[in-house]
Curated annotation (Swiss-Prot):
Domain Protein kinase: 100-278
Residues reported to bind ATP: 106-114, 129
Entry-linked Pfam families: Pkinase (PF00069)
Gene Ontology molecular functions: ATP binding; protein serine kinase activity; protein serine/threonine kinase activity
Matches recorded under PROSITE patterns: PROTEIN_KINASE_DOM (PS50011), PROTEIN_KINASE_ST (PS00108)
Full protein name: Ribosomal protein S6 kinase-related protein
Disulfide bridge map: none
Catalytic activity line of the entry: L-seryl-[protein] + ATP = O-phospho-L-seryl-[protein] + ADP + H(+); L-threonyl-[protein] + ATP = O-phospho-L-threonyl-[protein] + ADP + H(+)
Species assigned in the record: Mus musculus (Mouse)
Key words of the record: ATP-binding, Kinase, Nucleotide-binding, Serine/threonine-protein kinase, Transferase
Length: 278
């Protein structure tokens, strides 16, 4: 999935809004098709923020908060446009979708948009990646999109960004993960440098994650600072498995992929050792 990151930079795969942008302005208008026909719920900053422990990047009042919901249908047949994405993306009842409210925009990339949402039932904040089905089919990335979810369901590691849920609407796919307000690149851009002890800790945690993934036959193929989130205690959370692959023992991957700004001359040599190059 696209990086669940609050970094404000410009790379090929992620383009986050500039600090100070009105997140209830231009970007909300483009998403009205997702929650058309529904009302809005007005809630003050104190009420929303009292239900979560993370510090929001944007310190504006977030109201009204639209519902993360596609237009409800009385009956849902299973046409090919839905069955293609099963079973990784099941169809969720409308009432379950009504429990999610949008708090803000985290990032917007070529494959989709990542939203910060409030789960009213759990009283917890999550990140939801929204991917148009049309883009998935146009770019012939159906297998890649389904494998991203399948791989994340196999992973259970303290330094990996955990998958909460995945489902589909009539026009979009939704991938919900835990929310982290900071990534390694944003932290580095803010402080300018890391102490040696911090670098050792980050490196040790990253190596533990990569060894764990490789033992499962999983290669990430897009390890970079933007895809390394930080939890509230400062520990790493590797995220964005959109380019990952599951390989059988001894198999190799030969696809040239990743983020253009990070590719080197040896990028064509893609395999499990490729993850060790940042």
């Amino acid at each position: 999935m696209g990086a669940v990151s609050c970094r404000q930079g410009q790379h090929t795969r992620v383009s986050a809004p500039q600090k100070g942008d009105n997140i209830q302005g231009h970007w909300v208008q483009g998403w009205k098709s997702l929650w058309c026909g529904m009302g809005t719920i007005r809630s003050g900053l104190e009420e929303l923020w009292g239900l979560q422990r993370h510090q929001c990047l944007h310190q504006e009042l977030l109201q009204p908060a639209p519902l993360l919901l596609e237009k409800p249908q009385s009956e849902w047949p299973v046409p090919q446009f839905i069955s293609l994405f099963l079973p990784e993306f099941p169809v969720r009842p409308v009432r379950e979708q009504q429990e999610l409210k949008i708090l803000g925009l985290v990032a917007k990339g070529s494959f989709g948009t990542v939203l910060k949402v409030l789960d009213c039932a759990q009283k917890a904040v999550f990140a939801v990646k929204v991917v148009p089905k049309v883009k998935v089919l146009q770019r012939d990335t159906l297998r890649q999109c389904k494998e991203e979810v399948s791989i994340q369901r196999q992973i259970n590691h303290p330094f990996v960004h955990s998958l909460g849920d995945s489902w589909q609407g009539k026009q979009h796919l939704f991938i919900m993960c835990s929310y982290c307000s900071m990534d390694l690149y944003s932290l580095w851009s803010t402080v300018g440098w890391f102490p040696e002890d911090s670098i050792r800790l980050f490196a040790a945690e990253l190596v533990l994650v990569l060894c764990y993934l490789h033992d499962l036959g999983i290669i990430h193929r897009d390890v970079k600072m933007e895809n390394i989130l930080l939890d509230e205690r400062g520990h790493l959370k590797v995220t964005d498995f959109g380019l990952s692959r599951h390989l059988s023992q001894g198999a190799r991957a030969y696809t040239i992929c990743g983020t253009l700004q990070y590719m080197g001359e040896r990028e064509a040599k893609v395999g499990r050792e490729g993850d060790l190059r940042m």
